[in-house]
Design a protein with these regions (language model features):
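Active-site hotspot residues in diverse enzymes, especially metal/ion-binding acidic/histidine motifs
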Residues: 1-137
Length: 137
């Protein structure tokens, strides 16, 4: 079920910044996105230098479709969970409420990015997973 509050916020951000591309949104919000070696299991995390958030993404995904999901996921932490730090870990058996919320926002961002890129909604969730590298939940 789609949370209409989340959908409204995502649509507002897309309209305000003229895109749903999470990398462009981060840039327009002056949020640095850095690629670094985070090991095999850590896909991304948010760090802060003072009050300034930095999205750290695993360099192993720099040229892969999944870079969009991981960027959108970490961006969601910055926008909707300001001040909290976290990391997207593939092997985590326990997904916190914050991780679940960030994933929901990321998927809403990517549905809209798909519509922006293809002028239509994805026909299936699998189509969205394939295009933007959304990991199986």
């Amino acid at each position: 079920m789609v949370d209409l509050d989340k959908l409204g916020i995502v649509e507002f951000i897309g309209k305000r910044y003229g895109t749903f591309n999470p990398f462009v949104i981060a840039d327009k919000l002056n949020i640095a996105v850095e690629w670094c070696d985070l090991g095999h299991n850590l896909m991304g995390k948010v760090a802060y230098m003072g009050n300034h958030p930095i999205v750290l993404l695993n360099e192993a995904f720099k040229d892969k479709n999944s870079q969009y999901f991981y960027c959108a996921h970490e961006l969601a932490h910055v926008i909707w969970q300001e001040g909290l730090t976290g990391a997207y870990n593939l092997n985590s058996q326990f997904k916190s409420k914050f991780e679940y919320q960030a994933t929901q926002y990321a998927i809403l961002i990517l549905i809209n990015l798909y519509r922006e890129d293809y002028d239509r909604l994805p026909s299936t969730y699998r189509e969205l997973e394939t295009e933007y590298g959304i990991p199986e939940q």
